[in-house]
Amino acid sequence: MDQQQNFQPLAESFYQVPTLELAKNLLGCILVKQTEEGTSSGVIVETEAYLGNTDRAAHGYGNRRTKRTEILYSKPGYAYVHLIHNHRLINVVSSMEGDPESVLIRAVEPFSGIDEMLMRRPVKKFQNLTSGPGKLTQAMGIYMEDYGHFMLAPPLFISEGKSPASVKTGSRIGIDNTGEAKDYPYRFWVDGNPFVSR
């Protein structure tokens, strides 16, 4: 159901926790994007943690520092938007300044602005609207221009939601060429939610 709500960004202190903790805490929170068409939001139902320097699956592995990854070295709470196979993905920078860690938002459950989401991403099956990291950015109007936005203010931020009743943990998806890192249990999802990517 499309719902109207006065969303307020989470405080900066919310992001100032270890990355694995943040990945779990984000479940149930509401991702919000304001555009000219209106405000779209979704309840975060799936995340993945990437632990920077020591995590072969992370863009900051080995302290790689490029123009693309520079924002990962900022303080927590910034948006790291990047392209993979022409799909935009949104991560929340985590840990502490100088430590290139982040949390990927893998899936959300549509909450408000659903008509606008369907205009951006027409789907036959509603469940496919935001059930993956590239799907949710397309549906919500999250673009490369959002890279480096500090998520404590509009147009892109995260708002308080409700803690899920049950959370599952498992290995991350789509990182088969990263050695033992592919088996790390750094993916978190809301048990039983139909918008989880798999």
From Swiss-Prot:
GO molecular function terms noted in the UniProt entry:
alkylbase DNA N-glycosylase activity; DNA binding
Keyword DNA repair in the entry? The reply is yes
Q: Return the SUPFAM superfamilies for the record.
A: FMT C-terminal domain-like (SSF50486)
Residue ranges of coiled coil? none
Q: In which domain of life is the source organism classified?
A: Bacteria
Q: Does the record's keyword annotation contain Disulfide bond?
A: no
Q: Which Gene3D superfamilies match?
A: Methylpurine-DNA glycosylase (MPG) (3.10.300.10)
Give UniProt keywords alphabetically.
DNA damage, DNA repair, Hydrolase
| One Pfam match | Pur_DNA_glyco
Biological process (GO) annotations held by this record are: base-excision repair
Q: Enzyme class, one word?
A: hydrolase
Protein EC = 3.2.2.-
PANTHER family, A to Z: DNA-3-METHYLADENINE GLYCOSYLASE (PTHR10429:SF0)
Under the heading NCBIfam families, the entry gives: 3mg, PRK00802.1-2
Family label: Belongs to the DNA glycosylase MPG family.
Q: Specify the protein name.
A: Putative 3-methyladenine DNA glycosylase
Q: Species name for this entry?
A: Oceanobacillus iheyensis (strain DSM 14371 / CIP 107618 / JCM 11309 / KCTC 3954 / HTE831)
